[in-house]
Curated annotation (Swiss-Prot):
Belongs to the PSMG2 family. Forms a heterodimer with psmg1. The gene is psmG2. It is found in: Nucleus. GO terms for biological process: proteasome assembly. Keywords: Chaperone, Nucleus. This is Proteasome assembly chaperone 2.
Length: 269
């Protein structure tokens, strides 16, 4: 396959993804996944190690999303960036800032899956969101996060999710007449394509990759609180024995412009 990942220093030999969990944001309602990745990068010393470059991704370039007044390095942001941290040696974060070209999701998914296998990545974890208005009765109370998994997910992961009070996405519901109604698993776009690919290859002995998606029910709006909630959940999911019990979450400087400038409060006094 064509080169897919480019390291910062053009030397891929110093970077390993073997047995990593790759955390990827879905471009879904409220941008919960992308905002969550922002928080994780800022809070846990994740450093940019490279970029994913593919003809199926809309190219963009912009200002550094994580610049502070005392650390203005003038680093540019690009379409898809890859991050790792010494605090979580088996975790790789991906930040996707631009969409896949219309109609090219299957092509990008194929290239991504080949790269994941070539790098011996253990698991891909999507962070997703879906419309709270479309919940069924059993989803109205309790945790608003559900998981969707491939058939080959490790049982220990399922046990950990259950301990965190995260249930599997409901796929059926009973109608008042007693009929069973099939429900969507809420996957869309790239997550849906990768999920289908991994499940179709379960009988392939060469496929060692598992799929997991954490989906948060939400409404469109100012979704930073939901992103912080999801960040806390992800921390508890990936933390190790040396990690503090409670995370100190930080938000990036670029969040100051999420909703534009604030109003002049003196207008009302």
């Amino acid at each position: 396959m064509n080169k897919f990942f480019y390291s910062i220093d053009n030397n891929n030999n110093n970077i390993s993804f073997k047995n990593h969990t790759l955390i990827w944001p879905s471009l879904t309602l409220g941008n919960i996944g992308q905002l969550t990745i922002d928080v994780l990068i800022c809070s846990f010393e994740f450093k940019r190690i490279g970029f994913i470059v593919d003809e199926n991704i809309t190219p963009i370039i912009g200002n550094d999303c994580f610049t502070t007044l005392d650390n203005n390095n003038g680093i540019m942001s690009t379409s898809i960036e890859v991050y790792q941290s010494s605090l979580f040696p088996s975790i790789t974060l991906v930040q996707q800032r631009s969409p896949i070209v219309d109609g090219r999701i299957p092509n990008f998914s194929e290239n991504l899956f080949k790269w994941i296998n070539a790098e011996e990545i253990k698991e891909i974890l999507f962070l997703s969101s879906s419309n709270a208005n479309k919940r069924v009765d059993s989803q109205l109370t309790g945790s608003q996060v559900r998981f969707i998994k491939s058939d080959n997910v490790d049982k220990n992961i399922i046990s950990k999710l259950n301990e965190m009070n995260i249930s599997e996405m409901e796929l059926t519901v009973q109608s008042p007449e007693g009929e069973t109604i099939q429900l969507s698993n809420r996957l869309t776009g790239l997550a849906k394509e990768i999920y289908s690919t991994i499940n179709s290859k379960n009988n392939d002995n060469n496929n060692k990759v598992s799929f997991l998606c954490l989906n948060l029910f939400c409404s469109e709006g100012y979704n930073t609180n939901e992103a912080l909630q999801m960040s806390n959940l992800i921390y508890n999911f990936i933390k190790n024995q040396e990690s503090p019990s409670s995370p100190q979450l930080k938000t990036p400087s670029c969040w100051k412009l999420l909703q534009g400038p604030t109003f002049d409060q003196s207008l009302f006094f």
